[in-house]
A protein has these predicted regions:
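Short acidic/histidine-rich active-site segments
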Residues: 21, 169-173
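Extended substrate/RNA-proximal surfaces in nucleic-acid metabolism proteins
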Residues: 22, 27-139
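His/Asp/Glu-enriched short active-site or ligand-binding loop at hydrolase and phosphoryl-transfer sites
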Residues: 136-149
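Alpha-helical scaffold segments that flank or form the walls of functional sites
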Residues: 2-16, 36-44
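A short, acidic, amphipathic alpha-helical segment used as a generic capping/interface helix at domain edges
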Residues: 155-165
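Non-catalytic positions within long, well-ordered alpha-helices that form the structural scaffold/packing
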Residues: 5, 9, 103-104, 165
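Short acidic/polar active-site loop segments enriched in Thr and Asp
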Residues: 14-15, 19, 109
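Residue-level detector of anion-binding/catalytic polar loops
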Residues: 14-15, 48, 136, 170
Length: 173
């Protein structure tokens, strides 16, 4: 963490956010890592640190793979659907419900990359819920990479952005 803060300081950044994938993502950090983030100083090398996680949405009920007690200690929580972790039904209605339910969790700040065409979603419904719950929707740069693994992202991003503009919902990039 200190090395990243130093690199950020060297680039003149005032703040950075560090959001490692939560434990159910293969190769990610153990629960203990996330529990111990609360003791990490939030200012290092003159750079403000926002420490959190990218939690995995596990099912259509919006459950995530970290307990609320741990999420409550974080500065920033992103919740995303990832193929290795999501075990719920995969219809458009079920995926939409997964996002809507996750946004009801007061500890979740951002819905990560909802533009992945492998998980079709009702964008109007999630944009309206994002406005209601003050949850940001992420436009992920990996989604825009030519030849990326996510499908239909350009069209999905344009639809999401059009609706975010219409309903005045801010996004996260």
């Amino acid at each position: 963490i200190r090395e990243m803060a130093k690199a950020a300081a060297d680039k003149g950044l005032e703040a950075i956010a560090l959001t490692d994938h939560a434990p159910d993502m293969p190769g990610s950090c153990h629960l203990f890592y996330f529990q111990n983030l609360r003791v990490v100083p939030r200012n290092q090398c003159g750079v403000k640190l926002f420490l959190g996680t990218e939690a995995n949405i596990l099912d259509e009920n919006g459950s995530v793979d970290l307990p609320d007690s741990v999420l409550a200690e974080m500065d920033l929580v992103i919740a995303s659907i990832h193929p290795p972790c999501y075990k719920g039904a995969k219809t458009k209605k079920d995926i939409t419900n997964a996002y809507l339910a996750a946004m009801e969790n007061p500890h979740i700040d951002i819905i990560g990359h909802p533009d992945d065409g492998r998980f079709m979603v009702d964008y109007e419904a999630i944009v309206k819920k994002a406005k209601e719950t003050h949850t940001l929707l992420e436009l992920n740069n990996s989604s825009l990479r030519p030849g990326g693994f996510r499908v239909n992202t350009r069209e999905d991003d344009l639809e999401m952005l059009r609706l975010c503009k219409k309903y005045e919902v801010p996004i996260s990039i």
